């Protein structure tokens, strides 16, 4: 069903579009619900290319995001730096919003400005529950970004080796990550773990057949 079929404007009044984005920033659900049936366009963008849902997602305004998503906001609409509500929620560990985007058509193959899926920054930033959620959703485990790194490599190279990163490495291995997929310089996940003294991660990789 299109937005026009729902009674939402196809282009929108600029003043009301601005008001909708402001309401999203303030987590003002009542105002969002007041604006949408009138002349606000749900996916109208500001100068940064951000929709109201993108703004709500950045602020982790769960109620505003829910109202917008339920009204048909595009969870894959990218801003000027190639972030979408889905990708941003995954990268930042905004789990509740991420789950809503997954339930409303998130494009699992979409990538950010670094050519990475949502799983890669989630792993790099230590968001354990987010990694679990994205794996369960079916995001490609061994996707390689523009830097030549996978989620497994980023969890090791850019993490600190503590418990949350140990858990993420375990989750990725259990999901079938290629433990021998090296970076562009030919350095393997095992070599990166050894170089950083991450013994627990090293042992997990060895147990999974890393070389």
Question: What is the meaning of each model-derived region?
Answer:
Residues 10-55:
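N-terminal segments that cap or nucleate solenoid repeat domains
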Residues 22-27, 55-61, 88-94, 121-127, ...:
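Ankyrin repeat A-helix N-terminal signature
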């Amino acid at each position: 069903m299109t937005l026009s079929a729902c009674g939402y404007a196809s282009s929108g009044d600029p003043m009301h579009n601005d008001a909708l984005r402001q309401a999203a920033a303030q987590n003002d659900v009542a105002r969002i619900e007041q604006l949408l049936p009138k002349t606000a366009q749900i996916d109208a963008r500001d100068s940064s290319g951000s929709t109201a849902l993108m703004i709500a997602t950045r602020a982790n305004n769960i109620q505003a995001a829910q109202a917008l998503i339920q009204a048909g906001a595009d969870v894959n609409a990218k801003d000027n730096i190639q972030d979408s509500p889905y990708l941003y929620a995954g990268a930042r560990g905004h789990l509740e919003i991420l789950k809503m985007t997954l339930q409303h058509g998130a494009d699992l193959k979409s990538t950010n400005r670094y050519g990475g899926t949502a799983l890669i920054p989630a792993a790099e930033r230590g968001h354990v529950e987010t990694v679990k959620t994205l794996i369960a959703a079916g995001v490609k485990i061994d996707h390689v970004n523009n830097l030549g790194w996978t989620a497994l490599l980023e969890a090791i190279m850019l993490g600190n080796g503590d418990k949350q990163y140990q858990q993420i490495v375990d989750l990725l291995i259990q999901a079938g990550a290629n433990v021998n997929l090296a970076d562009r310089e030919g350095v393997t996940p095992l070599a990166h773990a050894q170089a950083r003294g991450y013994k627990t991660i090293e042992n997990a990789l060895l147990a999974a057949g890393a070389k």
